[in-house]
Protein backbone atom coordinates (compact mmCIF):
# COMPACT_ATOMS: atom_id res chain seq x y z
CA UNK A 1 0.00 0.00 0.00
CA UNK A 2 1.40 3.39 -1.07
CA UNK A 3 1.82 6.10 1.52
CA UNK A 4 -0.47 9.03 0.77
CA UNK A 5 1.92 11.91 1.15
CA UNK A 6 -0.83 14.55 0.87
CA UNK A 7 -2.52 13.30 4.04
CA UNK A 8 0.80 13.22 5.84
CA UNK A 9 1.74 16.73 4.78
CA UNK A 10 -1.69 18.05 5.74
CA UNK A 11 -0.99 16.99 9.29
CA UNK A 12 2.38 18.71 9.25
CA UNK A 13 0.93 21.96 7.88
CA UNK A 14 -1.17 22.29 11.01
CA UNK A 15 2.01 22.76 13.02
CA UNK A 16 3.70 26.15 12.81
CA UNK A 17 6.96 24.83 14.23
CA UNK A 18 8.59 21.43 14.55
CA UNK A 19 9.14 21.89 18.29
CA UNK A 20 6.58 22.99 20.84
CA UNK A 21 8.05 26.17 22.29
CA UNK A 22 5.84 26.01 25.36
CA UNK A 23 7.87 23.08 26.62
CA UNK A 24 11.03 25.15 26.48
CA UNK A 25 9.74 28.03 28.59
CA UNK A 26 8.64 25.99 31.58
CA UNK A 27 9.98 26.65 35.07
CA UNK A 28 13.26 25.33 36.38
CA UNK A 29 11.52 22.56 38.28
CA UNK A 30 10.35 20.99 35.01
CA UNK A 31 13.09 22.18 32.67
CA UNK A 32 14.28 19.48 30.30
CA UNK A 33 17.26 19.26 27.96
CA UNK A 34 17.34 17.34 24.72
CA UNK A 35 19.85 14.86 25.98
CA UNK A 36 19.60 11.25 27.08
CA UNK A 37 17.68 12.21 30.23
CA UNK A 38 14.89 13.75 28.16
CA UNK A 39 14.60 11.47 25.16
CA UNK A 40 14.12 8.34 27.21
CA UNK A 41 11.85 9.83 29.89
CA UNK A 42 11.88 8.53 33.43
CA UNK A 43 9.39 8.03 36.22
CA UNK A 44 9.70 5.22 38.71
CA UNK A 45 7.42 4.73 41.69
CA UNK A 46 9.56 3.28 44.45
CA UNK A 47 6.44 2.56 46.49
CA UNK A 48 5.11 0.14 43.90
CA UNK A 49 5.40 -3.21 45.67
CA UNK A 50 4.70 -5.14 42.47
CA UNK A 51 8.10 -4.20 41.05
CA UNK A 52 11.00 -6.60 41.49
CA UNK A 53 14.16 -5.08 42.93
CA UNK A 54 17.14 -5.18 40.60
CA UNK A 55 20.60 -4.33 41.89
CA UNK A 56 22.52 -1.36 40.43
CA UNK A 57 25.24 -3.75 39.30
CA UNK A 58 22.73 -5.78 37.29
CA UNK A 59 21.24 -2.64 35.75
CA UNK A 60 24.67 -1.41 34.69
CA UNK A 61 25.51 -4.80 33.21
CA UNK A 62 22.22 -4.84 31.28
CA UNK A 63 22.86 -1.29 30.04
CA UNK A 64 26.30 -2.20 28.71
CA UNK A 65 24.85 -5.25 26.97
CA UNK A 66 22.04 -3.21 25.40
CA UNK A 67 24.54 -0.54 24.35
CA UNK A 68 26.82 -3.06 22.63
CA UNK A 69 23.91 -4.85 20.97
CA UNK A 70 22.49 -1.58 19.64
CA UNK A 71 25.80 -0.37 18.25
CA UNK A 72 26.59 -3.69 16.55
CA UNK A 73 23.09 -4.50 15.31
CA UNK A 74 22.03 -3.36 11.82
CA UNK A 75 18.42 -2.89 12.97
CA UNK A 76 16.76 -0.91 15.72
CA UNK A 77 16.31 -3.16 18.75
CA UNK A 78 13.37 -2.97 21.19
CA UNK A 79 13.64 -0.20 23.75
CA UNK A 80 14.32 -1.43 27.34
CA UNK A 81 11.59 0.60 29.06
CA UNK A 82 11.94 -0.69 32.62
CA UNK A 83 15.74 -0.70 32.55
CA UNK A 84 15.95 2.93 31.46
CA UNK A 85 13.38 4.00 34.04
CA UNK A 86 15.41 2.45 36.83
CA UNK A 87 18.69 3.84 35.54
CA UNK A 88 17.44 7.40 35.19
CA UNK A 89 15.87 7.25 38.62
CA UNK A 90 19.18 6.07 40.09
CA UNK A 91 21.00 8.89 38.27
CA UNK A 92 18.58 11.45 39.70
CA UNK A 93 19.01 10.14 43.25
CA UNK A 94 22.80 9.95 42.94
CA UNK A 95 22.99 13.48 41.52
CA UNK A 96 20.96 14.78 44.43
CA UNK A 97 23.22 12.98 46.91
CA UNK A 98 26.36 14.40 45.29
CA UNK A 99 24.87 17.89 45.35
CA UNK A 100 24.03 17.58 49.05
CA UNK A 101 27.55 16.42 49.85
CA UNK A 102 29.22 19.14 47.76
CA UNK A 103 27.13 21.89 49.39
CA UNK A 104 27.95 20.62 52.86
CA UNK A 105 24.45 19.64 53.91
CA UNK A 106 25.65 16.28 55.20
CA UNK A 107 28.59 17.95 56.98
CA UNK A 108 26.21 20.22 58.88
CA UNK A 109 24.09 17.23 59.79
CA UNK A 110 27.15 15.39 61.09
CA UNK A 111 28.19 18.46 63.10
CA UNK A 112 24.74 18.69 64.69
CA UNK A 113 25.04 15.04 65.66
CA UNK A 114 28.36 15.72 67.44
CA UNK A 115 30.27 14.10 64.57
CA UNK A 116 33.21 15.95 62.99
CA UNK A 117 32.56 17.30 59.46
CA UNK A 118 34.20 15.69 56.47
CA UNK A 119 37.75 17.05 55.97
CA UNK A 120 38.88 18.31 52.58
CA UNK A 121 41.14 15.27 52.19
CA UNK A 122 38.02 13.08 52.23
CA UNK A 123 36.54 14.68 49.10
CA UNK A 124 38.17 12.04 46.90
CA UNK A 125 35.21 9.64 47.24
CA UNK A 126 32.95 12.47 46.07
CA UNK A 127 35.09 12.97 42.95
CA UNK A 128 34.95 9.23 42.27
CA UNK A 129 31.16 9.30 42.58
CA UNK A 130 30.93 12.20 40.12
CA UNK A 131 33.26 10.47 37.64
CA UNK A 132 31.30 7.23 37.78
CA UNK A 133 28.04 9.11 37.31
CA UNK A 134 29.38 10.93 34.24
CA UNK A 135 30.58 7.63 32.82
CA UNK A 136 27.08 6.22 33.15
CA UNK A 137 25.58 9.31 31.50
CA UNK A 138 28.04 8.99 28.62
CA UNK A 139 26.95 5.40 27.93
CA UNK A 140 23.27 6.35 28.03
CA UNK A 141 23.80 9.32 25.69
CA UNK A 142 25.79 7.17 23.28
CA UNK A 143 23.05 4.53 23.39
CA UNK A 144 20.32 7.07 22.63
CA UNK A 145 22.33 8.75 19.85
CA UNK A 146 22.83 5.37 18.19
CA UNK A 147 19.09 4.72 18.32
CA UNK A 148 18.24 8.17 16.96
CA UNK A 149 20.61 7.71 14.03
CA UNK A 150 18.80 4.48 13.13
CA UNK A 151 15.43 6.20 13.47
CA UNK A 152 16.62 8.84 11.00
CA UNK A 153 18.00 6.25 8.59
CA UNK A 154 15.03 3.86 8.67
CA UNK A 155 12.27 6.45 8.97
CA UNK A 156 10.14 5.10 6.10
CA UNK A 157 10.79 1.52 7.16
CA UNK A 158 9.52 2.25 10.68
CA UNK A 159 6.46 3.99 9.27
CA UNK A 160 5.75 1.00 7.05
CA UNK A 161 6.33 -1.33 10.00
CA UNK A 162 3.79 0.61 12.05
CA UNK A 163 1.15 0.26 9.32
CA UNK A 164 1.77 -3.46 8.82
CA UNK A 165 -0.90 -5.44 10.67
CA UNK A 166 1.17 -8.62 10.42
CA UNK A 167 4.19 -7.08 12.15
CA UNK A 168 5.53 -9.16 15.04
CA UNK A 169 6.43 -6.10 17.12
CA UNK A 170 4.61 -2.81 17.60
CA UNK A 171 6.20 0.60 17.40
CA UNK A 172 5.41 1.25 21.07
CA UNK A 173 7.56 -1.74 22.03
CA UNK A 174 10.31 -0.79 19.63
CA UNK A 175 10.54 2.89 20.61
CA UNK A 176 10.08 4.96 23.73
CA UNK A 177 7.35 7.62 23.88
CA UNK A 178 9.82 10.42 23.17
CA UNK A 179 11.42 8.45 20.36
CA UNK A 180 8.00 7.98 18.77
CA UNK A 181 7.42 11.74 18.91
CA UNK A 182 10.85 12.33 17.41
CA UNK A 183 10.22 9.78 14.66
CA UNK A 184 6.82 11.26 13.76
CA UNK A 185 8.11 14.84 13.64
CA UNK A 186 11.29 13.95 11.75
CA UNK A 187 9.49 11.85 9.13
CA UNK A 188 6.84 14.52 8.54
CA UNK A 189 9.45 17.24 8.08
CA UNK A 190 11.43 15.02 5.71
CA UNK A 191 8.35 14.14 3.65
CA UNK A 192 7.37 17.79 3.39
CA UNK A 193 10.86 18.69 2.19
CA UNK A 194 10.87 15.93 -0.44
CA UNK A 195 7.39 16.85 -1.63
CA UNK A 196 8.09 20.59 -1.91
CA UNK A 197 11.44 20.05 -3.59
CA UNK A 198 10.83 17.12 -5.94
CA UNK A 199 7.62 15.10 -5.82
CA UNK A 200 5.07 17.79 -6.61
CA UNK A 201 6.88 18.53 -9.90
CA UNK A 202 6.76 14.90 -11.03
CA UNK A 203 3.92 12.91 -12.64
CA UNK A 204 1.43 11.46 -10.20
CA UNK A 205 2.40 7.87 -10.97
CA UNK A 206 5.99 8.66 -9.93
CA UNK A 207 5.18 10.32 -6.62
CA UNK A 208 5.16 7.15 -4.51
CA UNK A 209 7.88 7.23 -1.88
CA UNK A 210 7.67 3.55 -0.94
CA UNK A 211 7.91 1.87 -4.34
CA UNK A 212 9.43 -1.60 -4.00
CA UNK A 213 8.53 -2.97 -7.44
CA UNK A 214 11.46 -1.47 -9.33
CA UNK A 215 15.06 -2.59 -9.42
CA UNK A 216 15.89 -0.35 -6.44
CA UNK A 217 13.93 -0.49 -3.19
CA UNK A 218 13.02 3.06 -2.18
CA UNK A 219 12.66 2.08 1.48
CA UNK A 220 15.95 1.65 3.31
CA UNK A 221 15.79 -1.51 5.38
CA UNK A 222 18.38 -2.90 7.79
CA UNK A 223 21.09 -5.04 6.24
CA UNK A 224 19.93 -8.45 7.39
CA UNK A 225 22.95 -10.14 5.75
CA UNK A 226 25.50 -8.14 7.73
CA UNK A 227 28.11 -10.27 9.48
CA UNK A 228 28.24 -9.81 13.26
CA UNK A 229 30.29 -11.26 16.10
CA UNK A 230 28.23 -13.01 18.74
CA UNK A 231 28.83 -14.55 22.15
CA UNK A 232 26.45 -17.38 23.04
CA UNK A 233 25.13 -16.77 26.55
CA UNK A 234 22.44 -19.39 26.92
CA UNK A 235 19.05 -18.94 28.60
CA UNK A 236 18.89 -15.49 30.28
CA UNK A 237 16.91 -16.81 33.25
CA UNK A 238 19.34 -19.68 33.86
CA UNK A 239 16.63 -22.32 33.34
CA UNK A 240 18.60 -24.56 31.02
CA UNK A 241 16.28 -27.54 31.33
CA UNK A 242 13.23 -25.50 30.29
CA UNK A 243 14.71 -24.06 27.08
CA UNK A 244 13.21 -26.02 24.15
CA UNK A 245 15.86 -24.75 21.72
CA UNK A 246 18.80 -25.87 23.84
CA UNK A 247 20.39 -29.14 22.73
CA UNK A 248 23.54 -31.15 23.37
CA UNK A 249 26.13 -31.67 20.66
CA UNK A 250 28.21 -34.79 20.11
CA UNK A 251 30.65 -33.68 22.80
CA UNK A 252 27.91 -33.34 25.41
CA UNK A 253 28.03 -29.54 25.47
CA UNK A 254 24.85 -27.42 25.40
CA UNK A 255 24.30 -25.57 22.13
CA UNK A 256 21.76 -23.92 19.87
CA UNK A 257 21.22 -25.06 16.29
CA UNK A 258 20.69 -22.45 13.57
CA UNK A 259 20.21 -22.84 9.82
CA UNK A 260 22.13 -20.85 7.21
CA UNK A 261 19.60 -20.28 4.37
CA UNK A 262 22.15 -19.75 1.58
CA UNK A 263 24.07 -22.95 2.32
CA UNK A 264 21.08 -24.87 3.69
CA UNK A 265 23.31 -26.11 6.49
CA UNK A 266 22.80 -26.34 10.23
CA UNK A 267 25.40 -24.87 12.58
CA UNK A 268 25.77 -25.61 16.28
CA UNK A 269 26.37 -22.59 18.53
CA UNK A 270 27.99 -23.87 21.71
CA UNK A 271 27.29 -22.01 24.95
CA UNK A 272 30.20 -19.74 25.91
CA UNK A 273 31.71 -19.66 22.41
CA UNK A 274 32.17 -16.79 19.94
CA UNK A 275 31.05 -16.96 16.30
CA UNK A 276 30.74 -14.81 13.18
CA UNK A 277 27.29 -15.11 11.63
CA UNK A 278 24.94 -13.23 9.38
CA UNK A 279 22.58 -11.16 11.48
CA UNK A 280 19.49 -12.74 9.98
CA UNK A 281 20.59 -16.18 11.23
CA UNK A 282 20.92 -15.18 14.90
CA UNK A 283 18.25 -12.48 15.03
CA UNK A 284 15.72 -14.54 16.98
CA UNK A 285 18.34 -15.67 19.50
CA UNK A 286 19.36 -12.05 20.04
CA UNK A 287 15.75 -10.99 20.64
CA UNK A 288 15.46 -13.78 23.24
CA UNK A 289 18.67 -12.56 24.92
CA UNK A 290 20.37 -15.91 24.33
CA UNK A 291 23.27 -14.37 22.40
CA UNK A 292 24.99 -11.00 22.68
CA UNK A 293 26.73 -8.95 20.00
CA UNK A 294 30.37 -8.06 20.61
From Swiss-Prot:
Recorded GO CC terms: CMG complex; DNA replication preinitiation complex; GINS complex; nuclear replication fork; nucleus
Keyword Nucleus: yes
Known outcome of mutating residue 67 to R: In sld5-12; temperature-sensitive mutant. Defective in DNA replication
UniProt keyword list: DNA replication, Nucleus
Matches recorded under InterPro entries: GINS_A, GINS_bundle-like_dom_sf, GINS_Sld5, SLD5_C, Sld5_GINS_A
UniProt cross-references to Gene3D superfamilies, sorted A to Z: 1.20.58.1030, 3.40.5.60
Subcellular location: Nucleus
Pfam family, one: SLD5_C
Alphabetical GO biological process terms: DNA-templated DNA replication; double-strand break repair via break-induced replication
Family: Belongs to the GINS4/SLD5 family.
Subunit structure: Component of the GINS complex which is a heterotetramer composed of SLD5, PSF1, PSF2 and PSF3. Interacts with PSF2.
Its job: Required for DNA replication. Functions as part of the GINS complex which plays an essential role in the initiation of DNA replication by binding to DNA replication origins and facilitating the assembly of the DNA replication machinery.
Name of the molecule in the record: DNA replication complex GINS protein SLD5
Name of the encoding gene: SLD5
